[in-house]
Amino acid sequence: MNTPKPQIAITMGDPCGVGPEIIVAALSDPAIRSACKPLVLGDRRAMQRALTVCNSPLELITVSSPAEAADLPDSVIPLLELSSLANTDIDYGKPSELSGDAVYRYIRRAAELCLTGEVAAMATAPISKEAMHRAGHHYPGHTELLAELCRCDEFVMMLAGDVLRVALVTIHEALAHVPALISTEQVLKTIRVTANGVAPLCGNRSPRIAVLALNPHCGEGGMFGSEEADAIIPAITAAQSEGLDVAGPFSADTFFHFAVQEPAPYDAVVAMYHDQGLIPLKMRHFDDGINITLGLPIIRTSVDHGTAYNLAGTGTASATSMKASIRIAAKLAATR
């Protein structure tokens, strides 16, 4: 018996960036069409212009609901139109208040559709935080906005590729603020949410989690900082007592040399701050990495790159990350 394909809400991202183009490219791939039923949430003019830029034979059809899009053929891109921007409003490479407000509406509606069960998951194209801020929507990024929309306090941002998966204890924080945010409770929460979120990607076995130190050489017995002894090691010990397969803390300067070996020794890595974990992740998975928000009551994946304003309108932006985010969203949806 054939398993029904999950319907995935795909938010268009910033109309002035590469989002519309990478969505067109992704939905032109038969492998993506075989994995899911797509529903794009966005703007008709922006998507139509992307079809032209990409020289795509796909047809854009406006629908009023996910149900209306469910049985459309693969030659069609179903669009739930949530903004009506004029061509003059879509200025490639230039974020604006109008585009920022439109982006917010796409994300909000996709989250609502996921929460009501009208779609199985959502995959998001890149946004401009500057544009959203201009429009009065003051969020550090997708992750924090979705956590608020889902009324979720325990969420984790994880970036992932085929070899590395890296979850963050702190996300968009100034480096000077990070040490004060490293607590036993925060590290333990991140370990728990990561283990639970990664399990479906590991055949639902207990995932192997590695935890990084904050300081050089794991603090060198307190010479370079006490966060390891005060917070990180107690969190690891508590997680182990709960039956989780957790190891560490590991010194970040050498850890990733071994972590990228295949087969990977760990299913996920918990890093203390943004650049500690994401520099090595992006060195290994710059093109194919994705973002997964763990801990939400919904499934949300995203590309692991920005709006690429310098490429907008050229039709040359890589859709590899967009394809991967849709594919993983569909895979996770199949486990629920």
Curated annotation (Swiss-Prot):
Main localisation: cytoplasm
Catalysis: reaction(s): 4-(phosphooxy)-L-threonine + NAD(+) = 3-amino-2-oxopropyl phosphate + CO2 + NADH
Binding site for a divalent metal cation: H172, H217, H274
Cofactor(s) in the UniProt record: Zn(2+); Mg(2+); Co(2+)
Binding of substrate, residues: H142, T143, K282, N291, R300
GO biological process: pyridoxal phosphate biosynthetic process; pyridoxine biosynthetic process
Pathway the protein acts in: Cofactor biosynthesis; pyridoxine 5'-phosphate biosynthesis; pyridoxine 5'-phosphate from D-erythrose 4-phosphate: step 4/5
EC number(s) recorded for this UniProt protein: 1.1.1.262
Localization per record: Cytoplasm
Keyword field: Cobalt, Cytoplasm, Magnesium, Metal-binding, NAD, NADP, Oxidoreductase, Pyridoxine biosynthesis, Zinc
Cellular component per GO, a single term: cytoplasm
Keyword Zinc included in the entry's annotation: yes
GO molecular function: 4-hydroxythreonine-4-phosphate dehydrogenase activity; metal ion binding; NAD binding
Source taxon at top rank: Bacteria
Cofactor note: Binds 1 divalent metal cation per subunit. Can use ions such as Zn(2+), Mg(2+) or Co(2+).
Family that this chain belongs to: Belongs to the PdxA family.
More info: The active site is located at the dimer interface.
PANTHER family referenced in this protein's UniProt entry, alphabetically: 4-HYDROXYTHREONINE-4-PHOSPHATE DEHYDROGENASE, D-THREONATE 4-PHOSPHATE DEHYDROGENASE
Cited function: Catalyzes the NAD(P)-dependent oxidation of 4-(phosphooxy)-L-threonine (HTP) into 2-amino-3-oxo-4-(phosphooxy)butyric acid which spontaneously decarboxylates to form 3-amino-2-oxopropyl phosphate (AHAP).
Subunit structure: Homodimer.
Protein name from the UniProt record: 4-hydroxythreonine-4-phosphate dehydrogenase
Species this protein is from: Trichlorobacter lovleyi (strain ATCC BAA-1151 / DSM 17278 / SZ) (Geobacter lovleyi)
